[in-house]
Amino acid sequence: MAIIDFKATKCRHCYKCVRNCEVKAIMVKDGRAEIMPDNCVLCGRCLQICPQSAKTLVSDLSMVKDMIEAGEKVVVSLAPSYMGLLKFHTIGQVRCALMRLGFADVRETSEGAALVTAEYAKLLSDGTMENIISTCCPSVNALIEKYCPQLIPYLAPVVSPMIAHGRMIKQQMGADTKVVFVGPCIAKKQEAQDPRHADCIDAVLNFNDINRWLNEEDIVIEDCEDTPFPQMDPRVNRLYPVTSGVISSVVATEVKRDSYRKFYVHGESNCIDLCQSMVRGEITGCFIEMNMCSGGCIKGPTVHDRSISRFKVKLDMEEQISREPVPAEETTPVLEQVSLNKVFFDRTPHDPIPSEAEIRQILAKTGKIRPDDELNCGACGYPTCREKAIAVYQRKAELDMCIPFMYEKSKSFANLVMETSPNVVMIVDEDMKLLEYSAVGEKYFGKTRAEALQMYLYEFIDPADFQWVFDTHQNIHGKKVHYPEFKLDTLQNIVLSLIHI
């Protein structure tokens, strides 16, 4: 099922999504951008930066409403980032507001994070892996499986907190329970559909979905009652959404000190740089927390208010967590063993690779015969002309995406018109300075193109009609004008262009 939907009619050939896609998982076909699911890692960057809003996220909201209306037992797994992204006085108000929407219960995903944290601590204690990469971020997992499969042995063989929590809830409340994850991540939607654990999460909503639904029902979170979360102590694992949150959680629960160096990386380009460094064998003996979103989950692609400071959110979350009371020992539930193991595998996209001769042939079609013809301007979305030529061969890109080539092509066409048109064509600016002058003008006005381009219109004909068009923004069509000094009768069309040259 599609995660991101493209509205073709809104796509305006700006190629901004192609430029910003770190893995170039967007193809352009018939001038319109399309996502290639096999190549996409669902970082959501294209969703954030599209200036035309041509990309929208497919929502599960109507499906969730149908579940509740059908009388299903529907439980929320609430990502801890809610503490920085929703407005409330106490966290219990959030639980109350969601239950008023019809959910049977609302639980925090940090419960599942506690199980994952324990597994990470075991891996660190065992010390058998050369490097350990956290596997909480499904976008990072997809990046490694698709583009750096050499690093799969470094991926912690552990499910994400969302999957762990889904299994926990269904174990406690029955297999027929519907679990809805609520968070800021779009890659979670694909993770929920993954055949490796497709029975754990039944739907995924983001906070925009929740806010829209609350508004529809006239529910204000700050006005709701404080209904505490009856669960195990999740406090330290609520830090997962912020940078270094996973590391902080693991360190806080370790029984004995391990020998791994620990650091975190966030942001698409930084994650790719690290992966390339690890492929080269430059990193060893490290536990690495990786998150594709710059700033962590609290800066996920569905967080529309980009002005939100991740630093302020982190401080707010830590303050909120510190105010939460430690649950009594007897409130901590005893769980049967929840399966947390996950197997990762190579999902490398198999794109055809052109020969050097084929690359040169494609480059030649856009006027790039010699290496110095390759401007590498990046306007098409690809960093080099060569990479763009490879994309053309792979049917990901089109020849006319090369803006310098299309400019030269249009200029050549314009020159051809100016040289061969049987009509006199003049282009002037608002000062009546001639910018273009067709070759046939010499026959009628006695001025060569070279001479005319050094002159103002009023130096050889009356510019009154041209000035009127500039002043009124009204065009003139089919006006008969006689020039006695040139013994010339004309039928004139004067058209205003608002393009500034």
Question: Language-model segments: which ranges?
Answer:
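Short, intrinsically disordered, charge-biased short linear motifs at domain edges
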Residues: 1, 7-8, 26-28, 36-37, ...
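Iron-sulfur cluster-binding cysteine motifs and their immediate structural context
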Residues: 3-6, 12-36, 41, 45-61, ...
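PAS-family sensory domains
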Residues: 14, 43, 445, 453, ...
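Iron-sulfur-associated redox domains of electron-transfer enzymes in respiratory
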Residues: 58-360, 383-391
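Terminal or standalone catalytic/regulatory effector modules within metabolic enzymes
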Residues: 343, 354-406
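Sensory modules in modular signal-transduction proteins
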Residues: 409-445
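Terminal output helix/cap of sensory domains in signal transduction proteins
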Residues: 450-491
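Conserved small/polar residues in nucleotide/adenosyl-binding loops
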Residues: 499-501
